[in-house]
Amino acid sequence: MNKLALYCRPGFEKEVAAEITDQASHLGVFGFARVQDNSGYVIFECYQPDEADRLARDIPFNRLIFARQMMVISDLLEDLDPADRISPIVAAFEELSQQVNFAQSSELFVETADTNEAKELSTFCRKFTVPLRQALKKQGWLSAKASQKCGQFLHCFFVKPNCCYVGYSYVDNHSSHFMGIPRLKFPADAPSRSTLKLEEAILTFIPRKEENKRLNENMIGVDLGACPGGWTYQLVKRGLFVYAVDHGKMAASLHDTGCIEHCAEDGFKFQPPKRKKVDWLVCDMVEQPSRISLLIGKWLLNGWCRETIFNLKLPMKKRYQEVILCLENLAVMLAEQNLNFDIQAKHLYHDREEITVHIALKP
């Protein structure tokens, strides 16, 4: 077991490769990434056996920026017989089970990469899931409760109709979503599709059990670059009063809520009203990532907000390096002022050439 598979948005394979190589080296694990442009996944092969399992346990998945899923995989199963794909797949799982106890497994995902070519296999994968699940259950696997906080999900990752990897991810260190993609429904009354970015960010960064405590009707938010109101919509939906900062017009439906004040100002110059305690800052402005980082840092250092979610638009080249530089600069700014904070970043499904960052100041 010396291989990891990591899913990603097509076109971001090199960023995933750089990130997993860095994260592995921090743990003293070395290997190389197999990258195929626009494939939607990366294979990281460790030089030593069993180290992939260690990485799947010890690299905090929620600290990976560009990966949608992380799992330990077998060697590629090739030339599967269309008349019986199940037998060699079960045999490959049996080989993996020599090192990992699949009695604690609870779910099976038969998946493809998130590309147009791979999606042509989606109907097959859906139909194949039922007989494969039955075969794996006969082995005594997939019987654990889905709500448990330990154990594994089993994965069968098809790259071609008769070629797949089999593997597993750890329940306490993976994405629980099929293909690593949350399925969100666009609200009919939302002003723009960008609303899904902030909804996914909230679901990603804030535990469900804490959401009502951290986003509620007793709080005030600021949305920089708010027009037409996709991000403001998510805050208003959760009860916040929002200062929507943008020279452009806001959706009439948001004005009708009575929960926003439209401030026709430059987002870089706006300051929160005096004697108003702002809890949340959100920002989705099209600007250089270094400039947005400085703006967010200013708000946090001045005590103008306690928690923030914002987007960093990525350059055409050296995207991973730019992200790390921006995050490190922000961390240094806050640490120099002795602020305690938690920072996370993710290339969300609803992001494109951008990442979403969450920072929360702690007491």
From Swiss-Prot:
It is an enzyme of class 2 (transferase). Its main location: cytoplasm. Monomer. Belongs to the class I-like SAM-binding methyltransferase superfamily. RNA methyltransferase RlmE family. RlmM subfamily. It catalyses: cytidine(2498) in 23S rRNA + S-adenosyl-L-methionine = 2'-O-methylcytidine(2498) in 23S rRNA + S-adenosyl-L-homocysteine + H(+). Keywords: Cytoplasm, Methyltransferase, rRNA processing, S-adenosyl-L-methionine, Transferase. This is Ribosomal RNA large subunit methyltransferase M. It comes from Haemophilus influenzae (strain 86-028NP). S-adenosyl-L-methionine binds at residues 194, 227-230, 246, 266, 284.
